[in-house]
Amino acid sequence: MIHKEIWRKILFYSIISIIAVIIIIPFFWMISTSLKERGALMAIPIQWIPDKVSFEAYQKLFKIFPFGRAIFNSMYVAIMTTFITISSAAMAAYVFAKIEFKGREKIFVLYLATLMIPGQVTMIPNFLVLKYMGLLNTFTGVMLPSLINAFATFILRQNMKVIPNDYIEAAVIDGASHFTIFYRVVLPLSKPIIAALGIITFMGTWNSYLWPLIILTSKNKMTLPVGLSLLNGQHGAEYNLLMAGSLISIIPILIVFLFTQKYFEKGLTLGGIKG
């Protein structure tokens, strides 16, 4: 019995190790390629570790394209979108979960029905509306269509519904307004799921490509994914340049995830239990 358990553990950790290596190899290859000189990219045999480490690709990257500006643009759009989206979703979730009014459930169902509409269907109408409002080639135009998130509202509502009404009733007796109850009672109890949704929203916005490509026309306002696509078109054969740009683009995501991993896992667990 003991031997069987040992072999099970060996098999389990062997499989996990193989999967981990398969996942890590592309990332390692990206780093290796970004540190190679152009002449070493097609070397035979393949150089997994460059014979000569070169930062030429990173230096060239910031010379041929306003990469620093693109990073700032992506960071600004991602942070603002995440903050406003989660704030609006949390307030809407509180209304649907804790405030009784006529037709609440029907309105919520209609609200959720928007999840069934593909983004491609609303892309042209959104573009025309933003054009009419004069918001093309602006960060506001990029952010505006995604500031209302029915999925985030649904997850937060499910989380808030299980918060005991006794807390809210006690706050009402003390003379607290709905805003005070929301800010001081409900939000602190919803921190893990808010953190998880915040990370998901940030990552989705940071990696967004098609909508910023349509809305933004100025090079100084382009986000990082759009900048990388232009890099691919102009310097398609310079793989070290492309890998350097791709590596820089994923660093912020890795940093955010590493520092918020425990909140992310806890939030998803709570969301699954309470949903």
Describe each region flagged by the PLM.
Residues 2-275:
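A structural signal for multi-pass alpha-helical bundles of membrane permease subunits
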